[in-house]
A protein has these predicted regions:
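Glycine/threonine-rich flexible loop motifs
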Residues: 38-47
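C-terminal and late-domain segments of enzyme folds
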Residues: 1, 78-80, 84-181
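Glycine/Thr-rich phosphate-binding loops of Rossmann-like dinucleotide-binding domains
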Residues: 41, 75, 82
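N-terminal beta1-alpha1 cap of cysteine-dependent amidohydrolase-like domains
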Residues: 1-35
């Protein structure tokens, strides 16, 4: 049977906290997170009845996905998109993430739907290797996946990953890395 889409506006945390909104997901076979600001998305949904409903649906086989910020929220440790700069200087987008450095990536809690990896998005197009490498070197789970634009990482129920789309997904595995200094 065809289902009607449920559109949820991210700025409405009060609604996300209600059982009546969470129940809109009852029976959902697919849940999609659009782009925007991943920190804002998690601030609205984290710890609410709606987030719990998303996890329940996922646990029984619903497909959960997202683009851009919607992909970033999938991991337990989420990249917010902000970079710490020495002395509080403003981030220069032309030189952002030019180096691999300790404690320069701002993170928050994501929805933990993709276990065991940190997700980064727009990866190749925006040259985010150093950002993800910096993070996987210092933070558990020490595995990162960078998904490029117009590309999807499909995670099967058995945990196997498959890439589909116009570009690629890149993994950085630092589980055996040793960092000096």
């Amino acid at each position: 049977l065809p289902r009607q889409p449920v559109v949820f506006r991210r700025e409405q945390r009060e609604q996300a906290a209600t059982d009546s909104v969470a129940h809109l997901l009852d029976g959902a076979t697919g849940i999609w997170f659009g782009g925007g600001d991943q920190a804002r998305l998690t601030a609205v949904l984290r710890g609410t009845a709606t987030e719990r409903a998303i996890h329940r649906r996922y646990a029984v086989g619903a497909v959960v996905g997202g683009t851009s910020a919607g992909a970033a929220v999938m991991s337990a440790l989420m990249i917010t998109g902000d970079e710490r700069r020495p002395g509080g200087e403003r981030r220069d987008t032309t030189t952002a993430y030019m180096t691999i450095a300790r404690d320069n990536i701002v993170t928050d809690s994501g929805f933990a739907l993709l276990g065991g990896a940190i997700v980064d998005q727009h990866f190749l197009r925006r040259k985010r290797h150093n950002r993800l490498i910096s993070l996987v070197l210092e933070r558990v789970p020490h595995l990162g996946v960078g998904i490029d634009e117009s590309t999807a990482l499909i995670v099967a129920s058995d945990g196997q990953w498959r890439v589909n789309g116009a570009s690629a997904a890149v993994t950085h595995n630092a589980k055996s890395a040793r960092v000096r200094g």
